[in-house]
UniProtKB/Swiss-Prot annotation:
GO terms for biological process: mismatch repair. Residues 334-362 are annotated as: Disordered. The keyword Plastid does not apply. This is DNA mismatch repair protein MutL. The gene is mutL. The keyword Glycosyltransferase does not apply. One of its GO terms (molecular function) is ATP binding. Belongs to the DNA mismatch repair MutL/HexB family. Residues 345-358 have a biased composition (Basic and acidic residues). Keywords: DNA damage, DNA repair. This protein is involved in the repair of mismatches in DNA. It is required for dam-dependent methyl-directed DNA mismatch repair. May act as a 'molecular matchmaker', a protein that promotes the formation of a stable complex between two or more DNA-binding proteins in an ATP-dependent manner without itself being part of a final effector complex. One of its GO terms (cellular component) is mismatch repair complex. It comes from Wolbachia sp. subsp. Drosophila simulans (strain wRi). Pfam families: DNA_mis_repair, HATPase_c_3, MutL_C.
C-alpha cells in the first residue's frame, strides 16, 4: 500500500482526539486561554453537559483582528518563543487547543484587543472556515461559542457519559482552575441554573473555603521549602475525609496536576490517621524551578515529569506530617519517648482483695506534684491516705480524692490542656473540665492511639512473660508462612513466638502495655491482617498496619467502667502522646464544647 500524506483536516481531527476527550476538555482549554490573557472575570455557560453548547467569556487582553485566523492554525501561539521552551509559565503553549476544538465542532470566536476600536468575529465548522470576519459587539476581551461538539466525529459521542456526569466533570475542571487562580472571578451556569459563583479573592485560603467549605474551621496550613522547591497550601484534619481523591487538589507552578507521586505523598502522610480506602482534603501548590520540571509531556498538559522525584516526595510528606503533628490534638507532640513499661490502667480491680494504690494513681500524684511548687505536699499526703477506703466506699472515696487532691490545686488546670475528669457517661465517654470548656473523650479511640504510638517506639517496648505460654493452632499454611516471615519483626513488637510444629506456635511473651488480652485471638487477627496486606507495601508500612491491629484489640473497650484516677491518667498520657487527637481509623478521640456555646444553648448569651 502506498504511503500518502494526510490532509490538514484529517490531521486536525486525529490530533483533536488527544486534546479534546470530552466537553470538560474544551472548557479547560478555553478557560486556560482566558487566564493566560490576564482576565479578572471569566464566565462559562454550558447546555446538555457541554455537548450542545459551551460559551466562555472573559475580560482579558483579547485577540487582534489580524490574528483571529492565525489562532486557528495548529502550533500558532502568542505565549512561547524558542528561548522560552524550558521555562514555560503559561497554562497553554502548544497552539493546539483552538484548531483541535474547531476540527470537531462548530465554533465562533469573537474578540476585542485592549487597544482596538471594535471587536471582530470569525467562525469555523468541522475545521473549515465559514465566511469572512465580521464586526461584533463586545466591550473587551474574548467570547467563544462552541456548538455541537463531536458532530464531525460522531463515534466519539458514544463514549461520552451521562449529562450529569459530563457536567460534574466540567465543575471539577473549573474548581481546579478557580482554586489556584483565586484573584479571578468565576461563574459557571448550566442552562438557567448557576452551578458556581466565585468572587475575586485575595488568598488561596479564602478561595479554598468557597470551593470546599470543609476547609473552614478544619484547615491546617502547609509551608515547606528546600533547595528552591516550595510547598504551600492547606489540608484538613483527618476527620474530614471522603471515599474518592477528588478533594485532593495539587498544583505545580500554578498548573492543576493529577500526579500519582503527589497523591501518594498525601496518602502516606495520612496513613496513620485515616482508613486506606479514604482520602483527605488537601490543596497543595508546589513551586519548582522551571528547569526541574517538564510540563510538555502530554497535549492535555495535566501530567508533568519531575527531575528529582525523591526530593519532591520528601518535601510533600515532611510538610504534611509537620502540619498534622502540630494540630492533631490541642497540644504539641512531645519528643520524649513514651513509657512503655506503664501497666494497663484499665484492668478491672479485684474487688475481693484489699486495694493498694495503682501505678497510675502514683503517676497521677507525680503529675500533680511536679513541677508546680504549690503542689509539693500532695505526694506526702498520699502516703498516709487510706486506699482501702476506696474499695469499701468507692463513690465517696473518689469524690474525696477529687475534692482534696484536685480541686484544691486549681492552678494545675492551666498546665493540662485536657483538664480533669469529672465523670464517665455510658461507660464509654469521659467528661473532663477545663476552665472555659468541656472535653468529651472517646475512651477506646483515645487509648487505641496511645497503645499504637507506644508500640511504634519499638526500642522501648517491654515484654511481659506469660505465666502459662499460649499454644496457638494455625489452620492454614499461609498463616504459618506469615509467622515464619515476620517472626523477627513480631519480636521487635514485643511478641516472643516459637514455632512448635507445622501448624502450631507457642506465644511466650507479649508487649506489657497490652495487659490481659486474648492471646490466641490477637495472633489470629495479626495473621489475617498480614495475609490481607499487599506484597508491594514497604516493610515499615506493613509493620504499622500490624501495630494498628494490635492497638485496636489491646485497648480499653467501650462499655468499660473507669475510675477517676484511670480517666485522669488517660488524659495525661494523651497530652504527652503525638497525634492523640485522632484514633488509627481517622475518628476524633475527643471533642470540645466551649462554655460560651453551652451558655448560648441556655440563652445566657
Amino acid at each position: 500500500m502506498a504511503i500518502i500524506l494526510l490532509d490538514t483536516k484529517t490531521i486536525n481531527r486525529i490530533a483533536a482526539g488527544e486534546v479534546i476527550e470530552r466537553p470538560a476538555s474544551v472548557v479547560k482549554e478555553l478557560v486556560e486561554n482566558a487566564i493566560d490573557a490576564g482576565s479578572l472575570e471569566i464566565e462559562i455557560k454550558i447546555e446538555s453537559g457541554g455537548r450542545n453548547l459551551i460559551i466562555v467569556t472573559d475580560d482579558g487582553n483579547g485577540v487582534e483582528k489580524n490574528d483571529l485566523e492565525l489562532a486557528f492554525m495548529r502550533h500558532a501561539t502568542s505565549k512561547l518563543s524558542d528561548s522560552e521552551l524550558i521555562e514555560i509559565k503559561h497554562l497553554g503553549f502548544r497552539g493546539e487547543a483552538l484548531p483541535s476544538i474547531a476540527a470537531v465542532s462548530r465554533i465562533k470566536l469573537s474578540s476585542k484587543a485592549r487597544e482596538a476600536s471594535e471587536a471582530w468575529s470569525i467562525s469555523y465548522e468541522g475545521g473549515e472556515k465559514i465566511g469572512e470576519q465580521t464586526p461584533y459587539s463586545l466591550s473587551q476581551g474574548t467570547h467563544i461559542e462552541v456548538r455541537d461538539l463531536f458532530f464531525a466525529t460522531p463515534n466519539r459521542l458514544k463514549f461520552l457519559k451521562t449529562e450529569r456526569a459530563e457536567t460534574q466533570s466540567i465543575v471539577d475542571i473549573v474548581n481546579n482552575l478557580a482554586m489556584i487562580n483565586y484573584h479571578i472571578g468565576f461563574t459557571l451556569t448550566s442552562g438557567n441554573k448557576k452551578l458556581l459563583k466565585y468572587a475575586k479573592q485575595t488568598s488561596l485560603f479564602h478561595r479554598l473555603c468557597e470551593v470546599e467549605e470543609e476547609f473552614q474551621g478544619s484547615s491546617l496550613e502547609i509551608n515547606e521549602e528546600e533547595d528552591g522547591i516550595k510547598l504551600t497550601g492547606h489540608i484538613c484534619k483527618p476527620t474530614v475525609n471522603r471515599g474518592k481523591s477528588t478533594q485532593i487538589y495539587t498544583f505545580v507552578n500554578g498548573r492543576p496536576i493529577k500526579d500519582n507521586l503527589l497523591i501518594g505523598a498525601v496518602r502516606y502522610a495520612y496513613h496513620d490517621f485515616i482508613p486506606s480506602d479514604r482520602y483527605p482534603f488537601a490543596a497543595l501548590h508546589l513551586e519548582i524551578p522551571y528547569d526541574q520540571v517538564d510540563v510538555n509531556v502530554h497535549p492535555n498538559k495535566s501530567e508533568v515529569r519531575f527531575q528529582n522525584k525523591k526530593l519532591i516526595y520528601e518535601i510533600m510528606t515532611r510538610g504534611l506530617i509537620k502540619a498534622l503533628s502540630r494540630r492533631i490534638g490541642t497540644f504539641p507532640a512531645h519528643d520524649q519517648k513514651m513509657d512503655s513499661t506503664l501497666p494497663d490502667p484499665f484492668d478491672k480491680p479485684d474487688v475481693q482483695n484489699e486495694r493498694r494504690p495503682s501505678p497510675f494513681e502514683n503517676q497521677l500524684i507525680k503529675e500533680f506534684a511536679s513541677p508546680n511548687e504549690k503542689a509539693k505536699g500532695l505526694s506526702e499526703q498520699s502516703k498516709s491516705f487510706d486506699y482501702t477506703g476506696i474499695q469499701k466506699f468507692p463513690a465517696q472515696a473518689e469524690a474525696m480524692v477529687l475534692e482534696k487532691k484536685v480541686l484544691e490545686q486549681v492552678d494545675l488546670i492551666e498546665s493540662h490542656p485536657l483538664g480533669f475528669a469529672r465523670c464517665q457517661v455510658y461507660n464509654t465517654y469521659i467528661i473532663a473540665e477545663v476552665r472555659d470548656k468541656l472535653i468529651i473523650v472517646d475512651q477506646h479511640a483515645a487509648h487505641e492511639r496511645l497503645v499504637y504510638e507506644c508500640l511504634k517506639q519499638k526500642s522501648s517496648i517491654k515484654r511481659q512473660k506469660l505465666l502459662l505460654p499460649e499454644t496457638v493452632e494455625i489452620k492454614n499454611q499461609a498463616g504459618m508462612e506469615m509467622i515464619e516471615i515476620y517472626k523477627d519483626k513480631l519480636f521487635e513488637m514485643g511478641f516472643d513466638i516459637e514455632i512448635k510444629s507445622e501448624n502450631k506456635v507457642i506465644v511466650k511473651e507479649i508487649p506489657a502495655i497490652l495487659g490481659a488480652i486474648d492471646v490466641k485471638e490477637m495472633l489470629i487477627n495479626i495473621i489475617d491482617r498480614l495475609t490481607e496486606i499487599e506484597d508491594t507495601l514497604p516493610v515499615e508500612d506493613k509493620v504499622n498496619k500490624i501495630l494498628a491491629t494490635i492497638a485496636c484489640h489491646g485497648s480499653i473497650r467501650a462499655g468499660r467502667k473507669m475510675r477517676l484516677d484511670e480517666m485522669n491518667e488517660l488524659l495525661r498520657q494523651m497530652e504527652k502522646t503525638p497525634y492523640s487527637g485522632q484514633c488509627n481509623h481517622g475518628r476524633p478521640t475527643y471533642i470540645e464544647m466551649k462554655l460560651s456555646d453551652i451558655e448560648k444553648l441556655f440563652e445566657r448569651r
